Every structure is written in C-alpha cells, then in structure tokens.
C-alpha cells in the first residue's frame, strides 16, 4: 500500500498509527510513501503533518510572496501487488520514456521500466498510441532495468502550435496476466539554445516570453478547488 502526495507545502511528515513513514522537503514535487508494514487489520490512523516554516534548506528561501502551507493537490492511496512498477524510484511512476526525432521523419522512443520483486516469469509490454488511439509500436521484454527502443514512422512533432502527444503504456505481465500497468504521455521534439538564435524548437527559432503568474487564489491559496 502506497500513499501518493502530489504536493505538500513546504515540509511534510507522514505517520501511520503514530509511526513515521517518511519526511519530504519541498512543496512542489510529488512523493510516495510505502505504508504496507505500518497498516494492520481494522481501523488505521493516517496523519500528514505539514508546515510552511521558512528554512534555508528548502526552496524558495525568500521572495516577495507568501509561502502557503498545506496539501493543495489531494492525496491518493494506491494498492499494488507484491511485484509492481517501482514507486520508490525518484518519485516517478516506475517508467521513463525518452523520445528522439529521427532524420527520416520518424522517431525512436527509448523506454525504461523499474520493477520491484521481479523474477524470470515477468515481462513488460510497451505499447505506443497516437492521438487518434491507433497503436503505432509495440514490444515485449523481460522485466529488468534494460532499455528497449521502439521506432514510430512519420512521427508528428510536438510544438506550441501543434502539441501532438503519444501515449505510452507499460504492462507488467506474468504468463499473459497483467499485474500492474502505468501510462504516460510524451511529445517528440528537439531543442537547442544558441547565442545568436536563442531557443530553437524543432529547427525553428522560437521566442520565449516569461509570464509572472502565480497559482495562488484569493481565500484559496494554492488550491483552486476544495481539497
């Protein structure tokens, strides 16, 4: 059993039945806590202590706006089998997808997965679908931490005018039975930064204009809706 906290400002300590499970610093990144061994049959007490005290070890250390405290993106309980995509891997979903455009107009997707308590009977199936839901690439490999590369012909690039996305699904399987599944979306693009042309997106100069916009709302703080 995992507890997912998408964001807690600015420092959070998770306790289950009075026992500390994890302490996380930083109010803008998600984190997971494995609370399996701290739970028992019947009722359990879950406490998340959150504080927004200004300390030099957490960003931002000082600014001209208020550092609100609290849970502003909700909290989720996630139940997974004993063998699952690793939720303890740097706060991610257990998979990493890196798309790269190819010279022939296609794209390669470098896929990596991280599985907990795996053995030789487990495999990971990768499936890539375009914006219309059509499967454009698929591959199966053993459930270890080696990467697998999938090729998508005539890939549509992501840009600000045409934000094309691909959906990558990883299924953890054992003898054709799915044990765990995660899905992520990604776009194919290339970018460089040069002194003369500044930011280059997909080979085209692209002006970057920053906007000073805070997510805070009157009487609501960082949370736009009731939590």
Feature locations, PLM:
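Surface beta-strand/loop "capping" patches
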Residues: 82-118
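Active-site-adjacent substrate/metal-binding segments within catalytic domains
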Residues: 1-5, 9-17, 22, 82-95, ...
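Ser/Thr- and Asn-enriched, surface-exposed coil loops between beta-strands
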Residues: 27, 102-107, 142-146
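Flexible, substrate/cofactor-facing loop regions flanked by secondary structure
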Residues: 108, 163, 222-223
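Exposed loop/turn and edge beta-strand positions of beta-sandwich/beta-sheet ligand-binding modules
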Residues: 29, 109, 122
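Extended acidic/polar, glycine-enriched regions
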Residues: 39-43, 112-195
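Accessory beta-strand-rich segments of carbohydrate-active enzymes
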Residues: 1-88, 118, 131
């Amino acid at each position: 059993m995992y507890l997912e906290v998408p964001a807690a400002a600015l420092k959070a300590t998770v306790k289950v039945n009075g026992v500390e499970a994890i302490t996380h610093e930083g109010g803008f990144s998600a984190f997971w806590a494995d609370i399996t061994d701290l739970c028992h049959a019947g009722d359990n007490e879950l406490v998340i202590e959150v504080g927004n005290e200004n300390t030099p070890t957490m960003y931002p250390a000082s600014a001209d706006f208020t550092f609100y405290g609290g849970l502003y993106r909700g909290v989720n309980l996630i139940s997974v089998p004993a063998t699952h995509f690793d939720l303890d891997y740097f706060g991610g979903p257990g998979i990493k997808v890196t798309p790269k455009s190819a010279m022939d107009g296609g794209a390669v997707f470098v896929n990596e997965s991280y599985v907990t308590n795996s053995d030789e009977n487990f495999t990971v199936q990768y499936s890539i679908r375009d914006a219309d839901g059509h499967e454009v690439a698929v591959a199966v490999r053993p459930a270890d931490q080696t990467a697998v590369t999938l090729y998508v012909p005539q890939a549509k690039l992501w840009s600000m005018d045409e934000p094309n996305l691909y959906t990558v699904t990883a299924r953890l399987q054992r003898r054709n039975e799915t044990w765990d599944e995660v899905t992520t979306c990604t776009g194919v693009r290339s970018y460089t930064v040069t002194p003369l042309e500044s930011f280059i997106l997909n080979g085209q100069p692209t002006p970057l204009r920053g906007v000073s916009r805070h997510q805070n709302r009157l009487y609501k703080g960082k949370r736009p809706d009731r939590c």
